[in-house]
């Protein structure tokens, strides 16, 4: 492979990655969420959502209602949680929410940060679920949980890049 072909391959790869990044940032701005698409990682929301479902989020509502399915993050924890709003309170123009997984026996109070009794709608929520695609996100779960699958995928990608004729 000559230098021109290598540069073309590199630029094509850079174009693909930059296009994906721009699409992600565009979705983030439209949905008003730093993470407009998330994958369900546990069975706590069954039967509504299964592990591996991809959720599409929207964070432009000023208020959530009891029964809405929201995604939130807790300080000190990196994985967002998908649960349903169980109760809401208002405190000095702030909407405070208590959530619970559909498949859980108790509310999420034990999941919240220390001394936190409710979620602050403006600070803790990533977004409200507006749509989903079943099981498509399972690939990301396999990649993160199975080392052999991850390295197998990387190996296949490397081999395809190495042996491509374009």
Swiss-Prot record:
Disulfide bonds: none
GO molecular function, one term: serine-type endopeptidase activity
Keyword Membrane in record: yes
Keyword terms of this UniProt record: Endoplasmic reticulum, Hydrolase, Membrane, Protease, Signal-anchor, Transmembrane, Transmembrane helix
Compartment list: Endoplasmic reticulum membrane
Record-annotated membrane-spanning stretches: 10-30
Catalytic activity, as annotated: Cleavage of hydrophobic, N-terminal signal or leader sequences from secreted and periplasmic proteins
Top-level taxon of origin: Eukaryota
Cytoplasmic side: 1-9
Membrane topology note: Single-pass type II membrane protein
One of the record's GO cellular component terms: signal peptidase complex
Active site: 44 (charge relay system), 83 (charge relay system), 108 (charge relay system)
EC number(s) on file: 3.4.21.89
Lumenal topological segments: 31-166
GO terms classed as biological process: protein targeting to ER; signal peptide processing
Entry-linked Pfam families: Peptidase_S24
Region (C-terminal short (CTS) helix): 152-163
Domain observations: The C-terminal short (CTS) helix is essential for catalytic activity. It may be accommodated as a transmembrane helix in the thinned membrane environment of the complex, similarly to the signal peptide in the complex substrates.
Family statement: Belongs to the peptidase S26B family.
Protein role: Catalytic component of the signal peptidase complex (SPC) which catalyzes the cleavage of N-terminal signal sequences from nascent proteins as they are translocated into the lumen of the endoplasmic reticulum. Specifically cleaves N-terminal signal peptides that contain a hydrophobic alpha-helix (h-region) shorter than 18-20 amino acids.
Subunit architecture: Component of the signal peptidase complex (SPC) composed of a catalytic subunit SEC11 and three accessory subunits SPC1, SPC2 and SPC3. The complex induces a local thinning of the ER membrane which is used to measure the length of the signal peptide (SP) h-region of protein substrates. This ensures the selectivity of the complex towards h-regions shorter than 18-20 amino acids. SPC associates with the translocon complex.
NCBIfam families in the cross-refs: sigpep_I_arch
Matching PANTHER family: SIGNAL PEPTIDASE COMPLEX CATALYTIC SUBUNIT SEC11
Name this polypeptide is given: Signal peptidase complex catalytic subunit SEC11
Gene source species: Candida tropicalis (strain ATCC MYA-3404 / T1)
């Amino acid at each position: 492979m000559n230098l021109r072909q290598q540069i073309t391959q590199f630029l094509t790869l850079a174009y693909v990655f930059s296009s994906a990044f721009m699409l992600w940032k565009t979705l983030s701005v439209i949905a008003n969420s730093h993470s407009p698409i998330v994958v369900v990682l546990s069975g706590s929301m069954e039967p509504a959502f299964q592990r591996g479902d991809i959720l599409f989020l929207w964070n432009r509502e000023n208020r959530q209602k009891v029964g809405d399915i929201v995604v939130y993050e807790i300080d000190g924890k990196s994985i967002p949680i998908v649960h349903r709003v169980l109760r809401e309170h208002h405190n000095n123009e702030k909407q405070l929410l208590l959530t619970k997984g559909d498949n859980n026996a108790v509310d999420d109070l034990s999941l919240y940060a220390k001394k936190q009794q409710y979620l602050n709608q403006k600070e803790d929520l990533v977004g409200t679920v507006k749509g989903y695609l079943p099981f498509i996100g399972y690939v990301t779960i396999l990649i993160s949980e199975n080392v052999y699958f991850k390295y197998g995928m990387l190996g296949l990608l490397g081999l395809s890049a190495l042996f491509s004729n374009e």
